[in-house]
Swiss-Prot record:
Gene3D superfamilies: 1.10.10.1410. Keywords: Allergen, Cytoplasm, Ribonucleoprotein, Ribosomal protein. It is found in: Cytoplasm. Plays an important role in the elongation step of protein synthesis. HAMAP family: Ribosomal_L12_arch. GO terms for cellular component: cytosolic large ribosomal subunit. The keyword Oxidoreductase does not apply. This is Large ribosomal subunit protein P1. Belongs to the eukaryotic ribosomal protein P1/P2 family. Residues 68-107 are annotated as: Disordered. P1 and P2 exist as dimers at the large ribosomal subunit.
């Protein structure tokens, strides 16, 4: 993440923390007050449009809650076990076929 993106992100978080609607003008105002000069105005517009109508505090509090994804993990592990058993059976069959051809070292 570039310095410009980081500065605009922090400005948006400051606005959300104060309960102020996030807009490009308000982001630019905060960046000006912080004396951040290297940010192009397009970044403020992009972030303002991306966050328009969204509750930033709710997004931040729900970042770590991935309940359904963790519930599906044991099912995937159970499905992998039969596949491993099939591979072992095939390997055993190949070993037996080598013995039938008389290529054993100690026959």
């Amino acid at each position: 993440m570039s310095t410009a993106e980081l500065a605009v992100s922090y400005a948006a978080l400051i606005l959300a923390d104060d309960g102020i609607e996030v807009s490009a003008d308000k982001i630019q105002t905060i960046l000006g007050a912080a004396k951040v000069q290297e940010v192009e105005p397009i970044w403020a517009t992009i972030f303002a449009k991306a966050l328009e109508g969204k509750d930033i505090k709710e997004i931040l509090t729900n970042v770590g809650s991935a309940g359904p994804a963790t519930a599906g993990a044991p099912a995937a592990a159970g499905a992998a076990a039969p596949a491993e058993e099939k591979k072992e059976e095939k390997e055993e069959e190949k070993e037996e076929s080598d013995e039938d051809m008389g290529f054993g070292l100690f026959d």
